Amino acid sequence: VNFFKGLSADELQARRAAAELAIKEMGISFTVYTEGENIDRAWPFDMIPRVISAREWSGVSQGLAQRTRALNCFIDDIYNQQKILADGIVPADIVLGSDNYKAQCEGASPRFGAWAHICGSDLVRDHRGRFFVLEDNLRVPSGVSYMVENREITKRAVPELFRNYSILPVDDYPLKLYEMLAALSPRAAKRPNVVVLTPGIYNSAYFEHAFLAQGM
């Protein structure tokens, strides 16, 4: 905050312009679906980052990992022993009557018990600084590519932040994603092929599909 307070209005505008130029050069966009047409828009970028301390992030990251494990245990139970249904914790009719429930998966047991390999949890922070999860996106979570590219743009616009402060990296996400997916391969290949399936260039998340495929 003190760093940005020390910048003049002209300096802030110049850095904002540099960030917008970087977004155009990097081709960062998303598709807005409107009636009758699809519109590609440049990614909106806030140059002032939301700061989370290492201590806070340690608690948040551990909580999210625990939450993802719990969600996988829930899915595994639903398709196997169904104890959570028998105990009445979750109404059976809601689960078994859902269009998303796949009876073909009953009795299945994926490697490492990983039904949901990626979880996109939407976090909010209240006025007391407490974090809450709004929802968990397990089927086709998207948005991580914008996080990685936001960091790259921030490095270009305000490189001083990365010289003067210890900031955790995020650019290794595609590699970690590949390693996780490769570990799930049923084949004993040294470097299994991992692909990203995409509906195509007109899909709203196509930028991310291409970004992750190239990064892996």
Residue ranges and their predicted role:
Residues V1-M216:
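Preference for protein termini
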